[in-house]
Amino acid sequence: MFLKKIYIKNFRNHEETQLTFKSRLVFFIGNNGEGKTNLLESISLLSYLKSFRESDQNQLLRWDTSDTFIRAEFESEGNEYLFEYGIEHSQTKRKKLKVNGEEFKKISDYVGYFRSIVMSPPDILIIEDGNVERRRFLDAFISSTNRYYLKQLIEYERLIKQRNAALKKENASDREIGIWDEPIIEHDSEIREIRTKTIQSLAGYFHQNLLQLSSGKDPYFLTYKPNITSKEEHKQKLIDNLRKDKAIGYTSCGNHRDTLPIGFDDKDLSGFGSQGQKRSAVIALKTACFQMIRDTTGEAPVLLIDDIIRELDVKRREYFVNLISECGQAFFTTTDLEGINEYVGNLTVDKEIYIIDSGKVKVFTEI
């Protein structure tokens, strides 16, 4: 996986930026607020078609403009791809996506073309904020490579919204609510099966990574505890919980209530871990995602690393450098130009530096 070119127009504070990449390691250097993370964000859209920072895509548009556009050329598994993505500022947020000139009517059909892993400071919330954030992380990770899962998830969420609307409806009959139960059960089962297999694999990578990061001092585990374990149990719970669900106005069982404990002996890292332990767990988890994609596809995903190296101690930096040496291509943002050589100066791979100032980009030099 290798990104060769990117062109962005009216994206955040970038009016028009065009870059060509020839190196495995690319650094975006600049003070806070100058637009370096915006560049990383534009690259992440090639994978996720949405920001890793912002839920409202209208915020991606440059101030006082009506649309934004991204064009990129990348190579994957020996094939060349031309990616074109436009977002129009409106209540409906009209989007148009083309790959090699072919328009995608459904965004979910694009999944898996450009694979990347984002590492950024807010990732610590995966540990600190518990199961809602962890389910969001897991869904995003699986959906980034599995189109079938994404379609199942989209349909499940649509069905839950429909059932919840019926639950809130005054004098809704049990039959009116129950018509949603069977399709919900079917989609829930598919999602649960894929989540189970994913966590079984991801957990192994995570545990080994964390042992290596902590020199064996933090033997924590990632586990998956589904809210429902079978179709039969799900059907019975929907019946048993109907009165309660009517009272609270939403569906109280299903995969949207799954838990993903990280810790040991029923103790979760969110409650007892130090900041260093939590940071190590995040790095171990994101590295596990990288390793799992690399091993299942045979090709390393692109790493997008947003200003986190300076937060790491010596041990974690060494681990990070080893990870970088395994990747196909990595993009970094940092304010610390002087520290780059200290982190990756010994790696015998090509490197490029770009200086970002008020949304303007210029080539600095090779390290």
Swiss-Prot record:
ATP binds at G30, N31, N32, G33, E34, G35, K36, T37. It holds the Pfam family SMC_N. Keywords: ATP-binding, Cytoplasm, DNA damage, DNA repair, DNA replication, DNA-binding, Nucleotide-binding, SOS response. Its main location: cytoplasm. GO terms for molecular function: ATP binding; single-stranded DNA binding. InterPro entries: DNA-binding_RecF (IPR001238), DNA-binding_RecF_CS (IPR018078), P-loop_NTPase (IPR027417), RecF/RecN/SMC_N (IPR003395), RecF_2 (IPR042174). The RecF protein is involved in DNA metabolism; it is required for DNA replication and normal SOS inducibility. RecF binds preferentially to single-stranded, linear DNA. It also seems to bind ATP. This is DNA replication and repair protein RecF. It comes from Leptospira biflexa serovar Patoc (strain Patoc 1 / ATCC 23582 / Paris). The gene is recF.
